[in-house]
Amino acid sequence: MLMNVEEFADLFTTPLYFSLISGLILAAIALVRVNVVRRASIGWYVLQTFLGFMSRQGTNASAQTIPLFGDFKISGIQFAIWQITKVLLFGAFFANLMFGFSVVYLVDGNDLGIDSIPTIFSLPFVTPPTDHSYATEKVVPMIPALLVLVPPLLGAIGTRLLLYIGVHHVIKTVTAFLHDSTEGKPKYLSYVSTLEAVIGIGVLWAGFNMFFGNQIDYNTKYAIGGTLVVGLALIAFSFLDRMRSRILTHMLKRDVYIRIITIVVIALIVGIAMSVNNSVADAKKIEYLGPYNAQQIGVNRYLGELDQIEEHIHDVTLKSISPNNISGYIDENKDVLDGIRVWDWQAAFAKLKPEIGLIPYVTFEDNDILRFNDKLYWTASMAPILPSSVSLENRWYNEHLVYTHVPEGFLTLEATDGSIVDSSELFPQRKIYYGEGGLLDTTWSGYPTNREGSTAELNNESYSGMGGLDISPPISWMFEPNFMISYPGDSIHVMRYKDVNERMSTLYPYFLFNLFGKELDSLPVTDGKATYWLVPLIIGYDTSNIPWSVGNPYLRLAGYALVDTYNGNIQLIQHGDDFFTDMFMAQYQDKVIEMPEWLEKQIRYPQELFNWKTEMYNIYHVTDVDTFIQANEFYEIPRGLDTYYIEAKPPGFEEPEFVGLLSLELRGSQGRNLAGYMVVENDTPNLGKMQFYEVPIDSDTKLLGPTSVREALDRDPDFAQLKTLLRNPRIGDNILYRVGEHDTYFIPVYTAGAGGVVAQLGTIAAVGAAFTGEYYVGLGDTQESAFEAYLQKLSGVATTSSVTSGGVSMIMDKTAREDAIMSIFEEKEIKITTPTSIQIPLSFSIGDIAFYSKADLESTTELITKFIGEAGVGKRILMWEVDDTINFGYLKIVDNVTELHYIAIEVGK
């Protein structure tokens, strides 16, 4: 802790201060006794009883060993000191960071809606209107207090009741029974009256807590009323029995029956009333459930900020373009077509993985889709790991002093054309000392401060940043005992909390860095010099105490943090405008910066928050109570579909923008067509703005969903023919784009190379999303040619596999492929010789490739050109065929030994 204070100063102590405040307040509420006359203490009583028992082990008189708790009293000074001691001793168990934060905020004169809390006690007894304005007026103002103040207070008060009503009186009753039994005069009626009071107060407390439930309906008032009546009845019986216990020692059998029957009758009355209501509600759902469902809709629309989502009716049409205008139409929409995301992550990873080479000390940790200069890139970030070859005795040295960072932490691939990009062009600073996963997550690193140019770090790197702190003996010895022997008199520079999320959760524990069971995604961004992790600052609360929330969480984006990958410095950027953001800014205003201009073109709205809001919208977009109860217009995200971050131009956009896209289907629908799609903007000032494009249910033209569009592709005869020729084809992401007035899916089809490792683009399919009974699919080697083929089919120009691109058939039979190969040699004026057999003792492969479609022609040409260049002018080129592979080779004499150097081109059958 002392090291944290020295390294982070108030960034570390501020959350501790809030926790301390909350611990003191809540512990005082739960533990401090105020009855200075009685001055009872359970703890001291138990201690003295135990000591007395140990000193009297030889006697059998338990009543003498165990004193009456009712007579036990400590001195006034001891009582006062003990109350303070309890708070200090047990305050840590009651620490609640957000409660302490809120108390400080309130003390500073701010408001969290406490004045609205009394309204909650009337909600179960009032039938609200059938619109959600009631919840907006009554519930929303009190939500901040219900989130941060009420739950810890209820917990502290409940603990107090448990200790000083429950445990206190149970101990008092048990000790009284032991003493009375020893004297032969047990007062059973007195004991029963005490237990009745304890149980009655417990039941009343349970009834009180029911006001703070997350669901209220037409039966809630009966449940609360019945619970409170039972509690009051038990307390009344307790008073009655207390008075009668002065005369009687035992409870009469009649009195037992009266108490049991009373509770049973109350339960029956409440149960019958609730059952009758349920029976009536089965036939009158709108009248009974409608008002409460309306409030549920209102509260959850507030929780999900659904009123901020713009809704548009999407008019799906299928318009053919005149063949004469197709070329011009493509040129008009070139801004969209040029930005189509052709490469998905699986294909990108297959191309990037070989780039890591044989390096044994790094591994892929995460991937992100990023944008730079209005282009999309797949970026793979890496983490340092310990090579498996490191022996056990060298493990400590290598973990802490050698493998301290990733030398070149990013690999990048352009998401449209699939070309691997030199990451240093995007990230000038690629050394990752603070990042994600691997050794950064599990260990610290360090070096002696007097190393004077000599370094043990990887690649002879010598860290010169501001991250970490210097620790001198004996602190360094306590931190790591090995330093006592290795560097007994030297200061050590230690770098801790190198994992980004761990670092953030240590200094800013208010935020969620693990959401829905997954670690929050952080993005690498750069200002052109330094590289940062962009960490979303998402605040989240449990809504169990908010009426009509039905348990859906309260989530808000308060802003972002920029964490320097080299120095570990943290800068905060504000984005939210909710009550917590106001609280946070009041305490951390000096740590907040304006959003840098360079970040505006790299920032991204958190996918986790976008998905959650969309899930909330799937249900609570329905504001009509009748439709909500019928539950026939709820949406769902298609199975297996994730958010696509793309450059697109949805309807109403003047130019392509970087957006997140989620397609939605009608829940329970068998047609698997889209009910619409949700987009979220990532450009400032509209960062986080969501828009939903709804397809009317009664629309004559349907919008195909991901499942349906895959079926459309499989049914296309052109694709069926091409699929048989491709090597191990894999269908990539099917992403919906709006190109001009056409909703179109662009689906890449990948094929493995001859080695079966590196992904190659076999073809691109453009599938019309608008459906009136016939599918339209275009294939091409680029997104433009695929879209052109789609428009040609739509206009009736091309209906079969005659679709061409650049004059070459997209789907080529074996003869066409062989002719294309031979034409390459003919263009080079190379003559081919076909021997009857090949019998050369030594043969060497120059390369191999699969050639099935026009998409493979370019790479095939490159291989043949390379082969001709190595053979040289005048060499005789041999050709022979084995199965479905054509081989070309030439003879070369090395050290008087004839060698065959050849290439293999697989052309199929």
Give the predicted meaning of each segment.
Residues L2-S805, I824, E862-T865, G869, ...:
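Soluble extracytoplasmic regions of secretory-pathway and membrane proteins
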Residues I821, I838-I840, I893:
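A compositionally biased, intrinsically disordered/low-complexity signal enriched
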Residues S491-V494, R667, M810-A816, F851, ...:
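Short, surface-exposed ligand-recognition loops at beta-strand->loop->(often short) alpha-helix junctions
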Residues G806-T815, S843-I846:
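DNA strand-break repair and replication-stress modules
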Residues K814-K831, T861-L863, I868:
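Amphipathic alpha-helical segments
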Residues T833-D883, N887:
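BRCT (BRCA1 C-terminal) domain core and associated BRCT-interaction motifs
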Residues Y510-E519, E827-Q839, K875-R876:
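Short, well-structured beta-strand/strand-turn elements
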